Structure formats: structure tokens, C-alpha cells
């Protein structure tokens, strides 16, 4: 914006006729000075001058409240408290990153990348230890903000995000897309964290453990006034959805970050492009060395393939991009005493040794337990009860024993012996050839497996039995009302009133939820069975490929490996699961209890004339929703990609097609307009 003289803004006479114009000018000036201070690091007025502008705007808004504009900087102080957070479905998933913990991990990642796309350069940036946030701007105005949540659905934290001073309520300039999603990290600077805990200490209140917890807790306040007082900050690290997709964007990740900065969004000054692998390692070491001197907490660095076209060619796996990795810093380490070992039995029957430690403060938390994983890990460490051990928080999250201190071993140290029988049900503990993990052979007869298996079966992503929480499942099993998943469907409301804090109304609601859960999908049912390494994505692929449970039950390992993203190991797990008679008994009992799903029609070869072809959509389609077009093309067997390459079979070009059309013409890719697409779809309807 054009600079407006400070004296003019502070002295201009205000009347009802010009109040709106003056207030807008003050808001624009204050917002511009915010960007210069937080983003450009080049303030052009003093703090006292900024305060005088703010006070003048506050006084005018008090006189003319009906003229307050949405992007006024005064609106950052927080509004009315919410009763709860609304849910927001992300326009596209907010994926997590794979981790590298050493040079070997990163080298393997680098090889996977270069094997697929050739030489690359990386955009390297600090991995902030905060909370991932999506911010949506429409016509340059902040419309909504959400947490990452489970990656697909997050919580609406718009009012809280508006209180973060470094986030512009309105983008700078006018060269941004009509709709732009900005993704980044909200965090609490170290100084703000220390001040927050100092205030809490003075009031004898509970202290926050670390800045990340403080940031997460602050952003999830129902009262945005509390968030406003917490001095949060934000750095943008990526573009999300952009509409229209024909809007010109930079061709590298680094340049896109500079675009975000030009629009007024804060971007870390520690970002660097590294063309050589040695430069990547040097960057990692440099940031690690300066970690304690930075104004914010980090737990590693993020390496992203810089070229956007190469990113698109690399694509994604189920939960993370193939073109980026988080190179984690070594966790903080401490020494403590191994006082004993307990053995826990998990949902799949895995018997896991858990170290009981003399409590020690490490990585911001007090640690008293750590997994020892399996017998192989115990042998590798050469560990005994009574040893002094070195504990660290792997990835700053999971406590891990990394070594023992042999010279401190007492004469009374004793070997760690795996139990021959399950510590929960007494069944034989088996360790199959080639597997590191020992397992209880008790299956669903084992109470530990039964509880975890039924919790999983009823969970939101499985059969989604509303109200069937962990404590309810534990009571149902403890009171011997349920011994297998099928028993859930035999429960009545009167039976469930036997549970603690379960009145007839709650029991009736839960009974209705159980009845409703009988109607599900094959994909959810497969996921609910708890087959090893079969997550949501794999369950969906299995359901789509085989179309029926009967076909899947008799599938061979070879047939299973034909399913998308199912390798030999997962195929063996699935085949072994359906080969076990007690698993089939459970499935048959569930079907007999009324669990069902709509039939899936397996597409015939005739119905998929585009099978094996790669199509791309670009530009604006006037007669057909883009998602509908994509779904109909996929139903005909096509793979719908996001970018044009030499492997593209056809580009559907709507209005304002832009660079993708030019690239398709350059590569000689077939181009089809919307009318031709509609004719094709109609012919194959």
C-alpha cells in the first residue's frame, strides 16, 4: 500500500461522513506495519508511534462500532468463548512426514528420490516443535483456520489464530489466488514460554512442560482471549490448495515460500536451498549446533525436494509425501537405573518387555518406563535388571533405552527371561521363525487381546460404535458380558445398566448405536478385524480389489500381492489370518449377528475402457464438478494425476488451462475439451 503520513492518520478530523475512510486507513496502516515488523523484520515506525495509531483506532471503533472492518488489528484480542470446537474437513489431507534419525536413514531416502527423478536439490528448514495449522484465505481475507487433527478432519480454531499477531488477517498486494490455503506451524517462542511459566509460578498454578504443549494448549482454548494473551507465533512452510489452479505459482518450494512472504506471511529466515548432499549434512549440523540459540524449539530439520515438478512425480504414500523427510535431532539423554521388567500383551498378542526405570527427567518429561521391544533388542543391549542405562526420547516422543553402562553393573544384576506362558491368560508364548516378536497363542481367549481387539473393533475408524469407549469395553469384559466382538451385538440396554455410571437412557442410546453399527462397509469391517499391518488404506484397497469377503477369505498370497500397496509381508499376514479357524469362527459369528454391508460391484474389463491410462484435469469445468469428473474417470479405470508428464495419456483442458495445457502440447499429449469429456462419459455411462 502507499504509505500514509503518520501525522495525517493521527490528526485528521473525523466526522460521521469520513469515519469509515479514516478507520480503514488506520487498519491498513497498522496491518502493514505488523507485516513489516513480523515478516520483513524492517519496522518503519517506533513502538510508541504504533501504539498511538492503535489507540486512535480503538477510540474510533468505540464511537463507530458498526464501522469496524473484519481485518482490523483490534480484532486480535479475542471474542466470545466457544462451547466446543467445530470440525473442519481439510480440502486435501494434511499428511505427516517420515523420519530420518541418522545419515543412513537420510541416505536411503535420498537414494529412493534420486532413483525415481534423478538429481535433486533440497529446500531445508528447521522442524518447528509446535502445532500444524491450515489457514484459508479467500480473496485475500482470512476465512478460516484449522488444526491438523487426524490429517483429514481438524478443529476450527479460526478465532484463536486471528489473535496471532504475525498472521495477516488480509494478504498484502493483489497477486494472490482467489483461494489460497497456507500451511504452517504455530508455536510459542522460548521467551514467551518462560514468561508464561513465570506468571503461572507466581500464581501457584500448574506449569507447562514444554513450549509445544503450551502452544497446543493455547490454540485449543475455547476462549480466544486466553489465546491472545499467550504470545504465539507462526511460520508458513507450504502452500496447500490453490484455486484456480491455473494461477501462476513459483516452480520451486523455496520460491513459493518467498511468494507467501510477499503476501505478508511470516517464513523462517533459516531456510536454505542445498544442491549437494554434503550441503544438506552441513545444514543439519549447523542448525543442530545453533539449536539452543534459536528463539524457538525445534526437534530436527525438514528436507523437501525443491523442484515442484519433481515433487509431483514422486507423489505420496498413504500418510506422507515421498519428496520430504524430517531429519530428527538426537534426543536428549540421561542415565538411570533399570529396576525391573514387566511383560505386556498387546492387541495382536505381541508380548513386549517394558523396562521399569527409576524416574528420570529427560526431554522435557519425567520418564519411568521404556519399551525394550523384543528379545533381540535385549540381547543386542546385553541388558540386565539392575543395570545403569542411558535413556533417550527417540524423536523426542518415545522413551528408549539406547545403551547400558557396563562399569556400573552390580553383582546382583539378573538376566531378563521371557515368560513361557502369557502373563495374562497363561497360554503358551510362541516366537515364530524369522520374527523378533514373541506372541501369546491365546488369540481372542486372552483377556489382554480381547480388550484391545474389541476396543479396536468398536473404534471410530472401524465399526464406529458411538459411546463404546475404552472404559465401557473394559467393564463389559470384566463383568463377563462380552468375550468376543460378536457378543457386542447380543447386548441389551438392560444388560448394560450393570455398568458403572450407565443409566437406562445412556444404555438405550448405546444399544441403538450398536444396532446401527451392524450396517457398515467391507473396508471398515476388514479394518475392524485387526489384521496385522492392515490399516485403513490397505483395508480399502482389499475391499475394492476382491469386492466380497468370500473372495478375500480364500485368496492366496500371490493373489493378495496383486492388490495396490500390498506387499509380500502384508499378504502373508492376511493369508495367515484367514487360515486360522478361530478367526473364521469370529467372522461367522459376526455375520450371524447381523453385521452386513452393501455389495461391491467388481468393475468388468468392458466397464473400464481407460484402465492403465493416466489422465490430468486442468482449468475450469463449467458443466461438471471437478471431483465428479475425477470420480467418473476413475470408475472407467483411469488414474487421475495432478501434473502432466510424458506418461500422461490425455489432458482435459477447461477454461484458463494455463501451464499444464502448454506442457501437454509440448509433449504431444492428447488434449480433450469439456464437451469431448462429457461425450466420452455419456458413451460409457
Swiss-Prot record:
Amino-acid positions noted as binding NAD(+) in the UniProt annotation, renumbered to this chain: 47-51, 96-97, 125, 148, 185, 304, 328
Catalytic activity, EC: 6.5.1.2
Catalytic activity reported: NAD(+) + (deoxyribonucleotide)n-3'-hydroxyl + 5'-phospho-(deoxyribonucleotide)m = (deoxyribonucleotide)n+m + AMP + beta-nicotinamide D-nucleotide
GO BP: DNA repair; DNA replication
Gene3D superfamilies the record matches: 5' to 3' exonuclease, C-terminal subdomain, 6.20.10.30, BRCT domain, DNA ligase/mRNA capping enzyme, Helix hairpin bin, Nucleic acid-binding proteins
Stored SMART domains: BRCT (SM00292), HhH1 (SM00278), LIGANc (SM00532)
Enzyme class per UniProt: ligase
Pfam families reported for this sequence: BRCT, DNA_ligase_aden, DNA_ligase_OB, DNA_ligase_ZBD, HHH_2
BRCT domain location: 605-685
Coiled-coil region list: none
Catalytic site: 127
Cofactor list: Mg(2+); Mn(2+)
MF GO annotations: DNA binding; DNA ligase (NAD+) activity; metal ion binding
Gene Ontology CC annotations of this record: cytosol
Protein residues bound to Zn(2+): 422, 425, 440, 446
Lyase listed as a keyword: no
Keywords: DNA damage, DNA repair, DNA replication, Ligase, Magnesium, Manganese, Metal-binding, NAD, Zinc
Xref: HAMAP family: DNA_ligase_A (MF_01588)
Family according to the record: Belongs to the NAD-dependent DNA ligase family. LigA subfamily.
Function per UniProt: DNA ligase that catalyzes the formation of phosphodiester linkages between 5'-phosphoryl and 3'-hydroxyl groups in double-stranded DNA using NAD as a coenzyme and as the energy source for the reaction. It is essential for DNA replication and repair of damaged DNA.
Protein's name according to its UniProt entry: DNA ligase
Annotated source species: Shewanella baltica (strain OS223)
Amino acid at each position: 500500500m502507499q504509505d500514509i503520513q503518520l501525522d495525517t492518520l493521527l490528526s485528521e478530523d473525523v466526522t460521521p461522513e469520513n469515519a469509515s475512510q479514516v478507520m480503514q486507513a488506520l487498519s491498513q496502516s497498522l496491518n502493514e506495519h505488523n507485516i513489516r515488523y513480523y515478516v520483513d523484520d524492517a519496522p518503519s515506525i517506533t513502538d510508541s508511534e504504533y501504539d498511538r495509531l492503535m489507540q486512535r483506532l480503538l477510540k474510533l471503533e468505540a464511537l463507530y462500532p458498526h464501522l469496524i472492518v473484519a481485518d482490523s488489528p483490534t480484532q486480535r484480542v479475542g471474542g466470545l468463548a466457544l462451547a466446543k470446537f467445530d470440525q473442519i474437513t481439510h480440502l486435501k489431507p494434511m499428511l505427516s512426514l517420515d523420519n530420518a534419525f541418522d545419515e543412513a536413514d537420510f541416505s536411503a531416502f535420498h537414494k529412493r528420490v534420486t532413483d525415481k527423478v534423478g538429481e535433486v536439490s533440497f529446500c531445508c528448514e528447521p522442524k518447528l516443535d509446535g502445532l500444524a495449522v491450515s489457514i484459508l484465505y479467500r480473496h485475500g481475507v482470512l476465512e478460516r483456520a484449522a488444526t491438523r487433527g487426524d490429517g483429514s478432519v481438524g478443529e476450527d480454531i479460526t478465532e484463536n489464530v486471528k489473535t496471532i499477531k504475525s498472521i495477516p488477517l488480509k494478504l498484502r498486494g493483489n497477486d494472490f489466488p482467489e483461494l489460497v490455503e497456507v500451511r504452517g506451524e504455530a508455536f510459542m517462542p522460548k521467551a514467551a514460554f518462560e514468561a508464561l511459566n513465570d506468571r503461572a509460578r507466581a500464581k501457584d498454578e500448574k506449569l507447562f512442560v514444554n513450549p509445544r504443549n503450551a502452544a497446543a494448549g493455547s490454540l485449543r482454548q475455547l476462549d480466544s482471549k486466553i489465546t491472545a494473551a499467550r504470545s504465539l507465533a507462526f511460520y508458513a512452510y507450504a502452500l496447500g490448495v490453490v484455486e484456480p489452479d491455473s494461477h501462476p505459482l513459483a516452480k520451486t518450494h523455496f520460491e513459493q515460500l518467498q511468494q507467501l512472504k510477499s503476501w505478508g506471511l511470516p517464513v523462517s529466515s533459516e531456510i536454505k536451498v542445498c544442491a549437494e548432499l554434503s550441503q544438506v549434512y552441513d545444514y543439519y549440523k549447523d542448525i543442530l549446533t545453533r539449536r539452543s540459540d534459536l528463539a524457538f524449539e525445534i526437534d530436527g530439520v525438514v528436507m523437501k525436494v525443491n523442484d515442484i515438478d519433481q515433487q509431483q512425480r514422486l507423489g505420496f504414500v498413504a500418510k506422507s509425501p515421498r519428496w520430504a523427510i524430517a531429519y530428527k535431532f538426537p534426543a536428549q539423554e540421561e542415565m538411570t537405573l533399570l529396576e525391573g521388567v514387566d511383560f505386556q500383551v498387546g492387541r495382536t498378542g505381541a508380548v513386549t518387555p517394558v523396562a521399569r526405570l527409576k524416574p528420570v527427567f529427560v526431554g522435557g518429561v519425567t520418564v519411568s518406563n521404556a519399551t525394550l521391544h523384543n528379545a533381540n533388542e535385549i540381547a543386542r543391549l546385553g541388558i540386565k535388571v539392575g543395570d545403569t542405562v542411558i535413556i533417550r526420547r527417540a524423536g523426542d516422543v518415545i522413551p528408549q533405552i539406547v545403551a547400558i553402562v557396563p562399569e556400573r553393573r552390580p553383582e546382583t544384576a539378573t538376566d531378563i527371561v521371557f515368560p513361557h506362558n502369557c502373563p495374562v491368560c497363561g497360554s503358551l508364548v510362541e516366537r515364530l521363525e524369522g520374527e523378533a516378536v514373541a506372541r501369546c497363542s491365546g488369540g481372542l481367549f486372552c483377556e489382554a487381546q480381547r480388550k484391545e481387539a474389541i476396543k479396536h473393533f468398536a473404534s471410530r475408524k472401524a465399526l464406529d460404535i458411538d459411546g463404546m469407549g475404552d472404559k465401557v469395553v473394559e467393564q463389559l469384559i470384566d463383568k463377563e458380558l462380552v468375550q468376543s466382538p460378536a457378543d457386542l451385538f447380543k447386548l441389551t440396554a438392560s444388560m448394560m445398566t450393570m455398568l458403572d455410571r450407565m443409566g437406562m437412557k445412556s444404555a438405550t442410546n448405546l444399544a441403538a448405536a450398536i444396532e446401527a453399527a451392524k450396517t457398515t462397509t467391507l473396508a471398515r469391517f476388514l479394518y475392524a478385524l485387526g489384521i496385522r499391518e492392515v490399516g485403513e488404506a490397505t483395508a480399502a484397497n482389499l475391499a475394492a480389489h476382491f469386492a466380497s469377503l468370500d473372495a478375500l477369505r480364500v485368496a492366496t498370497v500371490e493373489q493378495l500381492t496383486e492388490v495396490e500397496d500390498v506387499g509380500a509381508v502384508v499378504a502373508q499376514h492376511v493369508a495367515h489370518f484367514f487360515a486360522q479357524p478361530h478367526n473364521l469362527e469370529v467372522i461367522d459369528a459376526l455375520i450371524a449377528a447381523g453385521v452386513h454391508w452393501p455389495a461391491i460391484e467388481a468393475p468388468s474389463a468392458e466397464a473400464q475402457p481407460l484402465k492403465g491410462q493416466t489422465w490430468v484435469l486442468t482449468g475450469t469445468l463449467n458443466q461438471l464438478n471437478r471431483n465428479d469428473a475425477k470420480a467418473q474417470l476413475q470408475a472407467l479405470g483411469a488414474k487421475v494425476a495432478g501434473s502432466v508428464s510424458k506418461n500422461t495419456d490425455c489432458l482435459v483442458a477447461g477454461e484458463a488451462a494455463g501451464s499444464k495445457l502448454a506442457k501437454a502440447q509440448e509433449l504431444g499429449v492428447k488434449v480433450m475439451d469439456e464437451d469431448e469429456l462429457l461425450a466420452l462419459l455419456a458413451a460409457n455411462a
